[in-house]
Amino acid sequence: MMLATFSTEVQTVIETIRTNLPYILMMAGVLYAMHIFNWFVGYRLNQYGIVPRRLRGLPGIIFSPLLHGDFNHLFFNSIPFVILACLLSLYGWPVFIYASVVIILLGGFATWLLARNGSHIGASALIMGYWSYLLVFAYYQPSWLSIVLAVVCIYYFGSFLLNVFPRSAKSSWEGHLFGLLAGLVAAYTSPYFSIAWSNFLASRA
């Protein structure tokens, strides 16, 4: 009986990934479309990344995940983005959107407030947030699914942790660090969001 239930749950996970993957790929497609346009205009859009402690850098909190330095930068971000976004979407689209908003806004604002001067761009901070969310959510809400997702993140993406340390002048390690920390906050607050969202839907019924 337990084996049959587990098999059914695994099949549900597989079907959910199949359903969600096209939408995740569309999001990745937006990144590529933005980058092609940015390349066409000589990467002028990169000035609209997060510029720390400058008012003109505040919009970059929203736009920086869409901007990349070159096609290699985008390619090596898009692969983990698709994988981790698919895994996170298994918790449902409301949770996915909530986590994404928290990571982008909180991680981006911390980068704007505390990072080095320059224009901080790239989706890697968002990716780091997804990674840390999937890791610690297994602690806050343990289940076979959350534990499996955490193990996958550790096994295949454990080296991500090195990204929070200064390794290259061109790499925004601050963005990686604050994205990771924002993911922790999103994971901790996510159960409260889920309760509030359920109550909201119930009140509209």
Question: What do the predicted segments below correspond to?
Answer:
Residues 3-205:
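A detector for small-residue-rich transmembrane helices and their helix-helix packing motifs
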